[in-house]
Amino acid sequence: MDEILAIHNLTKKFDDLVVLDGINMSIKKGEVVVIVGPSGCGKSTFLRCLNGLENIQDGEVLLDGDVINPSKVKNNKSREKLGMVFQSYDLFPHKTILQNVTLAPVKVKKRKKDEVTQEALALLERVGLSAKKDNYPRQLSGGQKQRVAIVRALIMHPEVLLLDEITAALDPEMVREVLDVVLSLAREGRTMVIVTHEMQFARAVADRMIFLDGGKIVEEGTPQEFFDNPKTDRLKKFLQTFTYES
């Protein structure tokens, strides 16, 4: 697989607090990288830095060899190749589901509305929501809203999809319906960087696991290596928090 996303010495600070401390990472086309770690370790901030939602103090982010740091490049078309799905859905409450999905490709990419509508309907059908196309977000469950958010990202044809704790705000019964969609995307060979606390899902979907703590990559490996044979005491301790023994 060819490299699609490269991160070199990425450093992010909030005032004097170092949130990301010299992160280096290479992601290949079709690879699914899952990032886990304790709360406050910098996982979500890392995704926001990749997508240009946060400025960085040092380092660079390259997509297909092009620098996409927001502090160095303005209005870079390469940044449109990164799609992001947030924990909070971020749907427009005053627009229907279909309008939420079709707005960006028509307004931003200047695509024909009829063409976009047909693609949107096909994507909504794929995630089991075509019957909800004329509904408003307030009429949907949390799991349904998150599936709409995934469709809204996919219709922009991103080369890399960033998923930030997309099940964290969902009731347990709704988690599976969202994770099944993501798992199907992984099996298609889509490139994804996923932040999650769902360890069973991470093991099933990941090509590579990364453990982030204190703004640094502490350990990485295949899911089998990561879960069955962790090398560092810190990762062992972290994984133990997900097991319960009387």
PLM feature spans:
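C-terminal boundary and immediately downstream tail of ABC-type ATPase nucleotide-binding domains
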Residues: E220, Q224-S246
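ABC family nucleotide-binding domain
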Residues: D2-P223
